């Protein structure tokens, strides 16, 4: 399917011309207010847009499009309404693109024919018998008459086109003011266009049948069952124009007097030719939907005819009858009740369409949301199962990993109460980290540094539990490790330090605690049979809490080859109590 522009005089279609030079935009079928504005702008007679109806971008102003990038398609604003149409060409070519010139030629020829009979009769009455008797004068007189008639027809056709264009521009500006403007224009140009009225009425009555100039035929008032919306739409165009006129602010104007149209109809002997007066009398009644001024008669003394709209029901009953002349104010007053009825019919018509489309859209949205909700529930259930599995693994890891005996205690239980026996060593409790790194020296070793973590705790027994874990400062590789217990002799300051080291050495050190300082020395040392040499023979330790609240430890050592020499010094910062 090739997308084409729905405007009457537009030949743009998809694929024609350069790419993105012309874009196509669908009619807003779901927005009744905008759709009415689009239809009024397009002004196509007896036509209803579908979902395959489009308008090209040449019928919109530049400010009707949203600002986008150059490589993106044009996007209309939500309030955009088409306004660029060649309405003069449309009015003259309403019958079709190929018949425009033929219709204009037929109208001009009809006007010449209408005046040729009268001019011939007047010429025959004033012509001398001598000239009629001369056979050579007849061809010359015919040529003179034809030249005169053609000279008159040319300015009349131009004048008619100009008047139609002015009337159409007035209707485009405001539907309500267009009525008064057209009436004033018809009164001001009554005498100038009196001759053209009969010819144009005769042509429209012959070619149009029962369809008037506004494009509203009698089929609109007697639609079939499937064309109810089309019928109500045509009624709404009348309702909207009348309602718009009523809602405009009242401007003091001179009242328009009711004037009767003179019916000087003289029966003609010829059945094929129609005079100007007869053509006016037999022209179809003015449309009840759009008020258009009637052309005055040829007689210079005849007053200009007024606008003659009728209600829709009266127009249906009197199909070929003359319209009763009414003023603009009477039209507005008489149509006020009809406007409400037509508005209600139109709202029902469009609401029924919208309700169906809205129900379909809502149904699709509900199904889409249900699908999304279902997928979310599945994700939540999967997440819950994963959380349960992770919780089970975590519980299992907690049961398996028991770094300290205190971890066996329930976390909900309160910490155990300290035994009064170990109260003098309470300043050593807590978790300590070396800050700065510890330093190690010995005559047989290169100086080195290390990081160390110390845990000293109690479980309510008359002793303290300790562990010393050292690491390489750069690689964090585990190094020396030892753990054990610190006991106090009740009611004394005597302390015993029992330690087991990963080097295969077990030692017992004893000493005394004085305030916040503990000094101990090795009492007995045991080692495994395959321990490395040189063997340790004596160890001394000194713990103290300095003024900054940091714990210091100094270790001295004597081996089989070296006397007692300071080996380690480290300062700890308390991390947890």
UniProtKB/Swiss-Prot annotation:
<dbReference type="InterPro" id="IPR014878">
    <property type="entry name" value="THAP4-like_heme-bd"/>
</dbReference>
<keyword id="KW-0539">Nucleus</keyword>
<dbReference type="GO" id="GO:0062213">
    <property type="term" value="F:peroxynitrite isomerase activity"/>
</dbReference>
<feature type="compositionally biased region" description="Low complexity">
    <location>
        <begin position="157"/>
        <end position="170"/>
    </location>
</feature>
<dbReference type="GO" id="GO:0020037">
    <property type="term" value="F:heme binding"/>
</dbReference>
<dbReference type="GO" id="GO:0005829">
    <property type="term" value="C:cytosol"/>
</dbReference>
<keyword id="KW-0408">Iron</keyword>
<comment type="similarity">
    <text>In the C-terminal section; belongs to the nitrobindin family.</text>
</comment>
<feature type="region of interest" description="Disordered">
    <location>
        <begin position="240"/>
        <end position="324"/>
    </location>
</feature>
<comment type="subunit">
    <text>Homodimer.</text>
</comment>
<feature type="binding site">
    <location>
        <position position="444"/>
    </location>
    <ligand>
        <name>heme b</name>
    </ligand>
</feature>
<keyword id="KW-0963">Cytoplasm</keyword>
<dbReference type="GO" id="GO:0042126">
    <property type="term" value="P:nitrate metabolic process"/>
</dbReference>
<keyword id="KW-0862">Zinc</keyword>
<dbReference type="Pfam" id="PF08768">
    <property type="entry name" value="THAP4_heme-bd"/>
</dbReference>
<keyword id="KW-0238">DNA-binding</keyword>
<feature type="zinc finger region" description="THAP-type">
    <location>
        <begin position="1"/>
        <end position="85"/>
    </location>
</feature>
<keyword id="KW-0413">Isomerase</keyword>
<feature type="region of interest" description="Nitrobindin">
    <location>
        <begin position="415"/>
        <end position="577"/>
    </location>
</feature>
<comment type="pathway">
    <text>Nitrogen metabolism.</text>
</comment>
<feature type="compositionally biased region" description="Basic and acidic residues">
    <location>
        <begin position="247"/>
        <end position="266"/>
    </location>
</feature>
<feature type="short sequence motif" description="HCFC1-binding motif (HBM)">
    <location>
        <begin position="235"/>
        <end position="238"/>
    </location>
</feature>
<dbReference type="GO" id="GO:0042802">
    <property type="term" value="F:identical protein binding"/>
</dbReference>
<dbReference type="GO" id="GO:0008270">
    <property type="term" value="F:zinc ion binding"/>
</dbReference>
<dbReference type="Pfam" id="PF05485">
    <property type="entry name" value="THAP"/>
</dbReference>
<dbReference type="GO" id="GO:0070026">
    <property type="term" value="F:nitric oxide binding"/>
</dbReference>
<dbReference type="InterPro" id="IPR012674">
    <property type="entry name" value="Calycin"/>
</dbReference>
<keyword id="KW-0349">Heme</keyword>
<feature type="modified residue" description="Phosphoserine">
    <location>
        <position position="163"/>
    </location>
</feature>
<dbReference type="GO" id="GO:0006570">
    <property type="term" value="P:tyrosine metabolic process"/>
</dbReference>
<feature type="binding site" description="axial binding residue">
    <location>
        <position position="567"/>
    </location>
    <ligand>
        <name>heme b</name>
    </ligand>
</feature>
<dbReference type="InterPro" id="IPR038441">
    <property type="entry name" value="THAP_Znf_sf"/>
</dbReference>
<dbReference type="GO" id="GO:0003677">
    <property type="term" value="F:DNA binding"/>
</dbReference>
<comment type="function">
    <text>Heme-binding protein able to scavenge peroxynitrite and to protect free L-tyrosine against peroxynitrite-mediated nitration, by acting as a peroxynitrite isomerase that converts peroxynitrite to nitrate. Therefore, this protein likely plays a role in peroxynitrite sensing and in the detoxification of reactive nitrogen and oxygen species (RNS and ROS, respectively). Is able to bind nitric oxide (NO) in vitro, but may act as a sensor of peroxynitrite levels in vivo, possibly modulating the transcriptional activity residing in the N-terminal region.</text>
</comment>
<dbReference type="InterPro" id="IPR006612">
    <property type="entry name" value="THAP_Znf"/>
</dbReference>
<protein>
    <recommendedName>
        <fullName>Peroxynitrite isomerase THAP4</fullName>
        <ecNumber>5.99.-.-</ecNumber>
    </recommendedName>
</protein>
<keyword id="KW-0479">Metal-binding</keyword>
<dbReference type="InterPro" id="IPR045165">
    <property type="entry name" value="Nitrobindin"/>
</dbReference>
<dbReference type="GO" id="GO:0005654">
    <property type="term" value="C:nucleoplasm"/>
</dbReference>
<keyword id="KW-0597">Phosphoprotein</keyword>
<feature type="compositionally biased region" description="Low complexity">
    <location>
        <begin position="290"/>
        <end position="300"/>
    </location>
</feature>
<feature type="region of interest" description="Disordered">
    <location>
        <begin position="84"/>
        <end position="221"/>
    </location>
</feature>
